[in-house]
A protein has these predicted regions:
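ATP-dependent carboxylate activation and anion-phosphoryl transfer catalytic cores
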Residues: 1-179
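Phosphate-binding active sites in nucleotide-utilizing proteins
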Residues: 12, 194-200, 214-220
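Short internal beta-strands
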Residues: 184, 206-218
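Glycine-rich phosphate/diphosphate-binding loops that line cofactor/substrate pockets in enzymes
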Residues: 171-183, 202-203, 242-248
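Short glycine-rich anion-binding loops that position phosphate/pyrophosphate groups of nucleotides
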Residues: 83, 188-190, 255-259
Length: 309
């Protein structure tokens, strides 16, 4: 996600942000990180060049938002929006640059040269924007993220590291991070290889693993002791029973297929009722892992002004 301002002659890049969720999930439902943590500097430079060329070619006067996809070192342009985006307040606070105010003045004739604009990538901290999802108010709604936006708000976390910033954003969104207990894992076949390293890191942090049959088999074969539990409808006690009995601390569930989505709905509803954090993508699981790691250090509260002055 890129926010920029153009006066028709020059372009200022407000920030380049990396979504934690993959392309295909609505940007409003995805957490995002500033500065990006998994994009090469050469690719970021390519993104800057594309943004400037598009803004000038489209004769944009004011704000422009562009969404890119990044895969295997290649950059793909998804959409170009010649308008302000929902990330403008986040970027402005993270970089201490009043983008909306500057864009308003540019729109009525001001030049970007009149403003002392600093490069966005010189900020000495990490900022994370997290979506606030209303599933506790709508318990029958599917928690599976998709191109359809479901979030009703956003929060922001700032710190010196990604894990700490994401931890703060999670707390702001009302998601309490576990520090011990059992992690339930049930992932689709496409995610099984990617979950192994994440599961191993949870074990190193002291968590125990529990999973559905296929996922548990994969983890056990890779040297990770994993308890097997029934899916919904297979027998009792099943995973929903385990959640209701407060035996699960965190749920990682990436369903695929009609039966898996049925299970996901029952699992999601139970997690919401019992205040258990659930993540539905591998990338989100990795981010939560970083956040949990950072809980070993004391959280120091600072004002936004202290980060910039």
């Amino acid at each position: 996600d890129v926010d920029a301002i153009s006066d028709g002659k020059t372009v200022h890049i407000g920030a380049v942000m990396q979504h934690i969720e993959e392309a295909g999930i609505h940007s409003g439902d995805s957490a995002c990180v500033l500065p990006p943590y998994k994009i090469t500097s050469s690719s970021i430079e390519q993104i800057n060049i594309i943004t400037k060329k598009l803004a000038i070619k489209l004769n944009v006067i004011g704000l422009i938002n562009i969404q890119f996809a990044y895969k295997n070192g290649k950059v793909y342009t998804l959409e170009v929006n010649p308008r302000a985006s929902r990330t403008i307040p986040f970027v402005s606070k993270a970089t201490n640059t009043p983008l909306a105010k500057i864009a308003a003045q540019v729109s009525v004739g001001a030049s970007l040269d009149q403003f002392q604009l600093k490069p966005w990538d010189q900020i000495p901290h990490v900022a994370v924007k997290e979506a606030v999802l209303p599933f506790n108010k709508f318990p029958d709604e599917s928690i599976f993220l998709s191109p359809e936006m479901k979030s009703t708000g956003e929060v922001m976390g700032i710190s010196k590291s990604l894990g700490s910033a994401f931890k703060r954003a999670c707390i702001g969104a009302g998601n309490m991070l576990p520090i011990s207990g059992k992690v339930f894992i049930s992932v689709n076949d496409m995610d099984k290889l990617n979950i192994i390293s994440i599961a191993r890191d949870f074990v190193e942090l002291g968590f125990k693993l529990i999973g559905t049959e296929n996922t548990a088999n994969v983890l056990n074969k890779n040297g990770l002791s994993t308890q097997c539990v029934f899916k919904v409808g297979e027998g009792r006690p099943n995973i929903v029973d385990e959640i209701k009995n407060k035996k699960i601390s965190l749920v990682i569930n990436t369903p695929m297929g009609s039966q898996s989505r049925y299970d996901e709905k029952a699992i999601g509803r139970s997690c919401i009722k019992n205040g258990i954090l659930i993540v539905t993508t591998i990338s989100a699981a990795s981010a939560v892992l970083r956040a949990i790691r950072s809980t070993s250090t004391k959280t120091k509260v600072r004002s936004l002004q202290e980060y910039h002055y």
